[in-house]
Amino acid sequence: MRTVSSWSLHRTLGRFVAPDSSVSGGPCMEGSAEPGGLALLDLPEALRRRGYGSLQLCHFHLPSTSPAYLGQLRLALAAAGVALETLLVDDGDLADPEQADRVEAWMGRWLEAAEALGATRARLLVGRADPTPALIRVCAGRLKRLAEAHPRVRIVVENWAGVLGDARSVRAMLRETDGAVGLLVDLGNWGGPRKYEELGRIASLAETCHAKCRFTESGPDAQDFRHSLRVLKEAGYDGPLALVYDGPDDDEWAKLDLEHALCRGVFG
């Protein structure tokens, strides 16, 4: 079953960013919406027609979090037979002591939205600071509180920069949360000479994945992508492979087909 992140279709969706999607108010990223973009309520049917069975949805692609709108989107997903695999909450810094209380409350409201949408998981950001054992414990405590308050949605974190910028910190965070929080492994976030070694140290802990291939004007870095996928497969991973495309070519659907073919070449 094909899975995709809505970020991969940001251009298809008219580059829409909700005007109140930031913790501090206003949009969480710069950019202007373009006319003629696909409405989010029409995305489930578009996914169905192209063979996708599940979606990871960026929070800023939601134009409204009213109960009525969330209900409409849940019905549209159900009618198309598309599962909401993960709500990706793409703002917030739990590691910032001046903002952490406000961020935790804000994330709690997004977890309520995830529950209303029937999402299986919600991915939360941890923070931009350098990791220390004390900071990891503090952030883990906040994540555990959020998980306890929202048991109907599984919280996952991602191997990103900052607090979770290396395998040791990711493993420490999962250990400190005592199983209350899972891992979304992103194959494109890390680089450098130790990339595959670092991915190998966390791959067996992952329950969902961003299958992200780097693209340039000359095409995909297929060698790196295949190597990353093999690391995942050799660790016994059998969860979703959510396709992530953010390369220069505007033909997002075609590039997603290419990524899917590369995934099948490794996973079958």
Please describe what each predicted stretch is.
Residues 1-109, 115, 167, 178, ...:
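N-terminal pre-domain/capping segments
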Residues 2-9, 55-57, 84-89, 122-124, ...:
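Hydrophobic faces of well-ordered beta-strands that scaffold small-molecule active sites
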Residues 4, 47, 77, 114, ...:
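Conserved, mostly hydrophobic/aromatic
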Residues 34-36, 57-72, 92-102, 128-134, ...:
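Acidic-and-aromatic substrate-binding clefts and catalytic sites of carbohydrate-active enzymes
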Residues 49-53, 118-119, 152, 206, ...:
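A structural motif
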Residues 54-55, 144-230:
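Acidic/histidine-rich catalytic cores of soluble enzymes
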Residues 76-182, 255, 262:
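Active-site acidic/histidine proton-transfer and metal-coordination neighborhood
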Residues 222-228, 233-267:
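Long hydrophobic alpha-helical segments typical of transmembrane helices together
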